[in-house]
Design a protein with these regions (language model features):
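Hydrophobic/aromatic ligand-binding patch that stacks against planar heteroaromatic rings
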Residues: 18, 22-23, 42, 135, ...
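Glycine-rich dinucleotide-binding loop and its adjacent helix/turn
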Residues: 47, 139-192, 196, 224-225, ...
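A Rossmann-like FAD-binding core segment of flavoenzymes
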Residues: 109-112, 116-124, 130, 189-289, ...
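Glycine-rich flavin
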Residues: 2-5, 12, 21-28, 33-166, ...
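Residues forming the flavin
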Residues: 2-3, 8-12, 18, 26, ...
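Flexible, glycine-rich terminal cap/loop adjacent to redox cofactors
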Residues: 8-36, 41, 48, 52-62, ...
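FAD-site-proximal beta/loop scaffold in flavoenzymes
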Residues: 152-168, 251-328
Length: 450
């Protein structure tokens, strides 16, 4: 007998879990379909394990770059990869348990398996059919790979989190935040690391101050940056090493090669055609601002829509969707403007709003005023290994409304959230000037710029 639900989410990642739990809280009969572990990319092969590894790299850097100037004996050189991975796995297991508990508390049926549409209201899972009045597609994305000879010898970000040991020599190919973060972590943990980017720099869509500072630090601390590097082929050598060959004749031999050239939607195995759901030329599901697809009763959130590919965005969109559908809020939807983001690079980056070039293009040069600060964070200033910290406020109009906040340096990852609230509320430079600084902190620079 076919089982019927009020609401079904395909995909047990951040967006699917957030939306289905919110719907269940409002008394809806709900099911969540997931073939793998709960939590999706973020919890299992993304944000969470990446952040654990980033912390590990920071600890190593604290010991070897800064420890001696703070009076510590830093001759310790032992690092146990297996211990780190065990700790990371245990932490992720606790998150899985938490998800299971909350879903159970909300009486959500968790169905293990792959879902395929039979029609716009019917799904097939594990040979059985289920129906629903509302269906959410939250299948996320997966890493992309280049179409070159030897591509199979490399791994992607998923494969990085399955490594049994830290390789001695690593090449990371890509210029986005995933490539920058992975290269930074691997370099920070002590491997000889190379980052290959297709054009002149990584993170080219960020404010130029961010990009320039990141490249400056990379040139001093690593990883080794290779610009204008277009992969041609990968050759596996007799000793098991890999040689990455570039189109211009350059090459580099490493023990591990990681593709981090971008991500693509995971929409191709759920038989969208049977439901009539439209996708664009890149395979992303087309949705409106309310997360509606072209088919009534079918919705999509997260990385499979081509929107901002960040976990909190999928969570926020999923919850707002359930508020609209099941809590009598007909206009509830996510505002995708001014979404803050952090890159867990070395040093970390925080940014929200318009870059300086974007503001000048949108408002005109005569309407834009920029405030900057460049200094050395106290954490590194008392040592011989000093690292830059740079910040920028982008303001527009006679009232100097703040439309962009950008920073790179120690502590920026934890600093940005509150300032993002201020920008979202329409704060002006005068509002920042009228705020008393917290001293001594790096954050005080944002309210003392002149």
């Amino acid at each position: 007998m076919t089982k019927h639900y009020d609401y079904i989410a395909i995909g047990g990642g951040s967006g699917g879990i957030a939306s289905i739990n919110r719907a269940a809280m409002y008394g809806q009969k709900c099911a969540l379909i997931e073939a793998k572990e709960l939590g999706g990319t973020c919890v299992n092969v993304g944000c969470v394990p990446k952040k654990v590894m980033w912390h590990a790299a920071q600890i190593r850097e604290a010991i070897h770059m800064y420890g001696s100037d703070y009076g510590f004996d830093t001759t310790i050189n032992k690092f146990n990869w297996e211990t780190l991975i065990a700790s990371r796995t245990a932490y992720i297991d606790r998150i899985h348990t938490s998800y299971e508990n909350v879903l159970g508390k909300n009486n959500v049926d968790v169905i293990k398996g792959f879902a395929r549409f039979v029609d716009a209201k019917t799904l097939e899972v594990n040979g059985e059919t289920i129906t629903a009045d509302h269906i959410l597609i939250a299948t996320g994305g997966r890493p992309s790979h280049p179409n070159i000879p030897g591509v199979e010898y490399g791994i992607d970000s998923d494969g990085f989190f399955a490594l049994p040991a830290l390789p001695e020599r690593v090449a990371v190919v890509g210029a986005g935040y995933i490539a920058v973060e992975l290269a930074g972590v691997i370099n920070g943990l002590g491997a000889k690391t190379h980052l290959f980017v297709r054009k002149h720099a990584p993170l080219r869509n960020f404010d130029p101050m961010i990009t320039e500072t990141l490249v400056e630090v990379m040139n001093t601390e690593g990883p080794t940056l290779h610009t204008h590097a277009i992969p041609k082929a990968v050759v596996k050598n007799a000793d098991g090493s890999l040689t990455l060959e570039l189109e211009d004749g350059r090459s580099e031999t490493v023990d591990c090669l990681i593709w981090a050239i971008g991500r693509e939607p995971a929409n191709d195995n759920i038989n969208l055609e049977a439901a009539g759901v439209k996708t664009n030329e890149k395979g992303y599901i087309v949705v409106d601002k309310y997360q509606n697809t072209n088919v009534e009763g079918i919705y999509a959130v997260g990385d499979n829509t081509g929107a901002v590919e960040l976990t909190p965005v999928a969570v926020a969109a999923g919850r707002r969707l359930s508020e609209r559908l099941f809590n009598n809020k007909p206009d509830e939807h996510l505002d995708y403007s001014n979404i803050p983001t952090v890159v867990f690079s070395h040093p970390p980056i925080g940014t929200v709003g318009l870059t300086e070039p974007q503001a000048r293009e949108q408002y005109g040069d005569d309407q834009v005023k920029v405030y900057k600060s460049s200094f050395t964070a106290m954490y590194t200033a008392v040592t011989t290994h000093r690292q830059p910290c740079r910040m920028k406020l982008v303001c527009v109009g006679p009232e100097e409304k703040i439309v962009g906040i950008h920073g790179i340096g120690f502590g920026m990852d934890e600093m940005l959230q509150g300032f993002a609230v201020a920008l979202k509320m329409g704060a002006t430079k005068k509002d920042f000037d009228n705020t008393v600084a917290i001293h001594p902190t790096a954050a005080e620079e944002f309210v003392t710029m002149r």
